[in-house]
Amino acid sequence: MKTNNQVEIIIFKREGNELTFLILKRNPQKGGFWQPITGGVEEKETFEETAMREVREEIGVINDIKLIDIGYSFEFFDHGENHFEKVFAVELKPKTKIIISEEHTEFKWVSGKAAIEQFLKYENNKKGFEKLIDFLNQI
């Protein structure tokens, strides 16, 4: 059975000692739930290239994108297919302008705790946020 490779990119920013995380609400035709940036790896693309493309496409950020590999990935089964998802993070400058794609209806900057406890639908997404927060606390 074929495995679909995907990426998840958690966007964050620092303002003073505070970390906030970007979450996006998918449009109702795509489920209407909150999540980080996600997307599928296209033919001949690396995970890193996909992550960069998805950041450009989904939030309109084209400059100063430095991917952070947080060392977390997961697998899941959906719609009769296996999926492998590698998680990255990107730190944005506090004043970076966000322009969401038609895939989403709104975005919010929230604390990690709020993202995990109030907004994110899927456990694997929550775990990605937890891993990133742990990673950031170690550097």
Task: Mark where each language-model region is.
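Residues in well-ordered beta-strands of folded domains
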Residues: 10, 37, 89
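Generic structural signal for beta-strand residues in well-ordered domains
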Residues: 2, 14, 26-27, 81, ...
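Residue-level signal for short segments within beta-strands and strand-turn junctions
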Residues: 11-13, 25, 91-92
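Charged phosphate-binding loop/patch that engages nucleotide di/tri-phosphates or the phosphate backbone
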Residues: 118-139
